[in-house]
Amino acid sequence: MTRATSSAPSQRMLRVGEQVRAAITQVLQRGEVRDDVIEATVISISEVRMSPDLKIATAYVTPLGVSDHSVVIEALNRHARYIRGRLGQQLRQMKYMPEVRFRDDTSFDNYKKIDELLRSPEVSRDLDGDNDEQ
């Protein structure tokens, strides 16, 4: 009998991802990472996705007030091993400390594009036409 697999993360992956997100946030808020770029930037961590074996944590971050996100993402990835070590002190219940990878969170940009599309005159006209038919 084979087990059905789904692409949705398990409850355990979600729970551990949230714990890792909170721990990374604390490390960054305390200013434990000594890097001029990171210290000068407000960083929002929207989500941490865990691999199924819980050995890789991909943190989706949004640097606020910075036009070039790649500079901040590169700085975070340079210090990923140090951040991983700091996580080990906070997440003692984990058997393996996950490798941390930082990626730019583009979901806000996607939401903004969708909102702009919905507010465009063409779409508004189509939506109003649908309401008239009902």
From Swiss-Prot:
Gene Ontology MF annotations: ribosomal small subunit binding
InterPro entries: KH_dom-like_a/b, RbfA, RbfA_dom_sf, Ribosome-bd_factorA_CS
Domain of life: Bacteria
One Pfam family here: RBFA
One annotated GO biological process: maturation of SSU-rRNA
Broad class of the protein's primary localization: cytoplasm
Keyword Transcription among UniProt keywords: no
Keyword field contains Hydrolase: no
Cellular component GO terms, alphabetical: cytosol
Gene3D superfamilies: 3.30.300.20
Subcellular locations according to the entry: Cytoplasm
Keywords in alphabetical order: Cytoplasm, Ribosome biogenesis
Subunit structure: Monomer. Binds 30S ribosomal subunits, but not 50S ribosomal subunits or 70S ribosomes.
PANTHER family: RIBOSOME-BINDING FACTOR A, CHLOROPLASTIC-RELATED
Function recorded in the entry: One of several proteins that assist in the late maturation steps of the functional core of the 30S ribosomal subunit. Associates with free 30S ribosomal subunits (but not with 30S subunits that are part of 70S ribosomes or polysomes). Required for efficient processing of 16S rRNA. May interact with the 5'-terminal helix region of 16S rRNA.
Family membership noted in the UniProt record: Belongs to the RbfA family.
NCBIfam families for the chain: PRK00521.2-5, rbfA
Name of the protein this chain belongs to: Ribosome-binding factor A
